[in-house]
């Protein structure tokens, strides 16, 4: 499935494809994410890579999915979602390749994930980032996400969870 978007001028050729964690398009993004987690939080990339994949059943349609943003055949950004509760999707593994940052691709990815989850009937998005990811915090703050208390999730070593939500519909009750 290809998802059209109306990206900023720098990303006119970015297109989104549905994938799985085992997809060759997802592998370089997950490997780089594991490397960066190791740099920011400690541990080894292989340790982080062992827990990064979300169980495939949780990403299966209609409840979940993984979108990879591809530019000229190269995966540059990606993110997943899974059912959190009856009206909420949880965003997971939001990532943009280091070589493609500061070009608006993460914002375009969030817009694509928001459109896809809304089309699947979700009314709210929830996500957790870590205290050593200020770029992610800034992205979510700038794109209309609101900080909320994290559901019970213990801190792990240097990782302190920071939770965000965004309502996709204005008529929430």
Where are these regions (language model features)?
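Loop/helix-junction capping segments adjacent to catalytic residues or to phosphate/diphosphate-binding pockets
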Residues: 24, 103, 134
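Conserved catalytic-core motifs of GNAT/GCN5-like acyltransferases
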Residues: 21, 49, 126-131, 137-163
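Active-site acidic-Proline motif in GNAT/NAT acetyltransferases
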Residues: 97-103, 131
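Conserved GNAT acetyl-CoA-binding A-motif
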Residues: 110, 117-129
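A generic structural signal for beta-strand entry/edge sites
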Residues: 86-88, 124, 161
């Amino acid at each position: 499935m290809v998802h059209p978007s109306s990206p900023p001028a720098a990303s006119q050729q970015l297109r989104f494809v549905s994938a799985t964690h085992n997809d060759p398009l997802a592998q370089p993004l997950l490997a780089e994410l594991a490397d960066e987690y190791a740099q920011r939080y400690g541990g080894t990339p292989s340790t982080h890579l062992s827990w990064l994949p979300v169980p495939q059943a949780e990403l299966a349609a209609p409840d979940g999915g993984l979108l990879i943003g591809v530019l000229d055949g190269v995966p540059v950004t990606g993110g997943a979602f899974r059912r959190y509760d009856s009206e909420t999707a949880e965003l997971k593994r939001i990532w943009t390749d280091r070589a493609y940052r500061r070009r608006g691709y993460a914002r375009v990815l969030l817009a694509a994930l928001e459109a896809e989850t809304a089309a699947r009937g979700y009314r709210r998005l929830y996500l957790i980032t870590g205290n050593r990811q200020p770029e992610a915090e800034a992205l979510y703050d700038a794109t209309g996400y609101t900080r909320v208390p994290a559901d019970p999730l213990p801190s792990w070593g240097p990782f302190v969870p920071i939770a965000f939500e965004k309502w996709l519909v204005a008529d929430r009750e």
